[in-house]
UniProtKB/Swiss-Prot annotation:
Domain notes: Contains two rhodanese domains with different primary structures but with near identical secondary structure conformations suggesting a common evolutionary origin. Only the C-terminal rhodanese domain contains the catalytic cysteine residue.
Record-linked InterPro entries: Cyt_P450_CS, Cyt_P450_sf, Rhodanese-like_dom, Rhodanese-like_dom_sf, Thiosulfate_sulfurtransferase
Task of the protein: May be a sulfotransferase involved in the formation of thiosulfate.
GO MF: heme binding; iron ion binding; monooxygenase activity; oxidoreductase activity, acting on paired donors, with incorporation or reduction of molecular oxygen; thiosulfate-cyanide sulfurtransferase activity
Reaction catalyzed: thiosulfate + hydrogen cyanide = thiocyanate + sulfite + 2 H(+)
Claim: Transmembrane is one of the keywords in the record: no
UniProt KW keywords: Repeat, Transferase
Protein name per its UniProtKB record: Putative thiosulfate sulfurtransferase 2
């Protein structure tokens, strides 16, 4: 797919702020950012309250999505330009939503809010409202979504890409460093997964790297282009960014996202993989009464214990 089919530049965006049938939509991790200022004429989607089911941990359904877009003044035939902060990670999340429910004309503003601000382009604090429409969402296209059983069946069969940070992947931490409250239930990663942090696909200004750079990034990490791919993180915003890169920019057709099905969602019969140091640290944190016969650092330093037989990682299960 050509980049112009899924991306617009900041120059194009500024020239088309008032174009008919073009709607700019801001979706941010920081849901208050839009309220401070935004691209003139852009409307807001709140990823927490607008895109999440209020009762269960799932997406809004087609009826809810139709109601949402109708109330915000978006029509089926509109071209929707999505943007946000932090390299467009939640904008990519919303992009995936629009594709899930069959919206044909949707693109990302390359570089998002970061590039727009770096360029010194104008922002507005004026409230925005649009006339109500009668939007009709299509039934969900679940071919771009992977469910739990599909993830379990994919272990050592398909490409599994863990797009979180290396420290989350190894089990050292349970959440993004700047969001310590957003913890997974289990440390580590799904066995067989490769780690390609989502943010490596972006340049310093938030724009996407070239196709050549992106292809090399995933090839160097061990992505097998002949296999289907499932990307995962924790909530889905980071894996949506990777899904956009692989499918919309690089043209990989069999790419799915597993929302909420990282290592923390695997049943007791599945495993998370983590390094030994992290394992013992997590073990003693969970069970304070547990005492090791010898400090693990001492075992490691003396060359004894598990490291002495070449074991540097463990497959572990955690109680749910």
């Amino acid at each position: 797919m050509a980049r112009c089919d899924v991306l617009v530049s900041a120059d194009w965006a500024e020239s088309n702020l008032h174009a008919p049938k073009v709607v700019f939509v801001e979706v941010d991790e920081d849901t208050s950012a839009y309220d401070r200022d935004h691209i003139a004429g852009a409307i807001k989607l709140d990823w927490r309250t607008d895109l999440q089911d209020p009762v269960k941990r799932d997406f809004v359904d087609a009826q809810q999505f139709s109601k949402l877009l109708s109330e915000r003044g978006i029509a089926n035939e509109d071209t929707v330009i999505l943007y946000g902060g932090n390299n467009n990670w939640f904008a990519a999340y919303a992009y995936w939503y629009f594709k899930l429910y069959g919206h044909e004309k949707v693109k990302l503003l390359d570089g998002g809010r970061k590039k727009w601000e770096l360029d010194g382009r104008p922002l507005s604090s004026d409230p925005v409202s649009r006339p109500v429409t009668s939007y009709t969402a299509s039934p969900p296209d679940n071919t771009i979504r992977a469910f739990r059983d599909e993830v379990l069946a994919a272990i050592n069969v398909k490409n599994l890409i863990d797009v979180r940070s290396p420290d989350e992947f190894s089990g050292k931490i349970l959440a993004p460093a700047h969001l310590p409250q957003e913890q997974s239930q289990r440390p580590g990663h799904i066995p067989g997964a490769i780690n390609v942090p989502w943010s490596r696909a972006a340049n310093e200004d938030g724009t996407f790297k070239s196709d050549e750079e992106l292809a090399k990034l995933y090839a160097d990490a061990g992505l097998d282009n002949s296999k289907e791919t499932i990307a995962y993180c924790r909530i889905g915003e980071r894996s949506s960014h990777t899904w956009f890169v692989l499918r919309e920019l690089l043209g990989h057709q069999n790419v799915n996202i597993a929302f909420g099905y990282g290592p923390h969602a695997c049943p007791a019969s599945a495993y998370s993989r983590m390094c030994l140091t992290t394992f013992f640290t997590s073990l003693t944190q969970r069970f304070p009464q547990l005492q090791l016969a010898r400090p693990f650092e001492d075992l490691e330093r003396r060359g004894k214990g598990l490291h002495s037989v070449g074991i540097k990682e463990l497959l572990v299960t955690w109680p749910t």
